[in-house]
Structures are given as structure tokens and as C-alpha cells.
Amino acid sequence: MIFKLNGQPVTVKCPPAYTLLEVLREELHVTGPKEDCAKGECGACTVIKDGVPVCSCLVLVSQAEGSEIITSEGLVKDGKLNPVQEAFLEEGAVQCGHCIPGMIVSASALLMRNPNPTVDEIRTALSGNLCRCTGYSKIISAVQEAAKQRRR
């Protein structure tokens, strides 16, 4: 299988029934996406596939053939965090950190499509990402702040 991962072409040899999450973590050693529920319900494994956030635990690696995959690691450019990552830190939206890569990927995908989302659009974009530690108000504030920073 050949696809782009965080801007770089990768080739993996594995059974086509492996999930994208299995390949990312076990074959390519990308640790941002996490396996929690393995049912696509928690969002911890969210990646951007061809511009759309997807649960990588539900995507077969064969479905990623020729795709562009972006993980939370791929949002860092030249060692600099992207505006969403920065805003999550500044707004205190991070507690244990387990859900954060998926949250950041979902929020980044939203801002790529819609640079000025409403609170309801942010809630909808993050509705597939669960956080056990914190209320979502700081997370929503972080996405609003990131949108503001991106517009500057």
C-alpha cells in the first residue's frame, strides 16, 4: 500500500484487512492516534484522510491506498505547533492529554474547511471526540481562539 503520511510518501506491506490505526501505530510508529473503543465512537484515533476527519480504527489500510493522511504529528511544521495546538495549550484545554490528538485533528480539519466557525459548528465538528477529564468549554474556546489566530 502506498499513501502520503503527513506529507511524505510511505509504502507499507501488511494484510489489507489491517486498520489504518494498526498500521499507523504498529508499522509506522505514529503514536498520536490512540485506540480506545475500536468502534469509532470515541474519536481518539481521528486522522484527516483526504481532507476529512475519520476514525482510523474503522478505515482498512487498503482504503487508504493513494490517500493523503494527516495525524496530529503532521500538523507541526518546522518544529512549530499549529494554531489549534497552540490554542489548546493557551486556553488550558489539555488535562490528561489522551483525547487531545483526536480533538486537535478534528478541530484542524474544521478550520481547514471553515475558517470562521460558529460555536454550534465547532460542537458538531467535535461531537465524535470524547473527553473524560474536562468539560468541553475550554476546548471550544481553544478552537475559537485558533480560528481567530488563523485569520490574522
Regions picked out by a protein language model, each given a short descriptive name:
Residues 1-152:
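Signature of N-terminal electron-transfer/Fe-S-associated modules in redox systems
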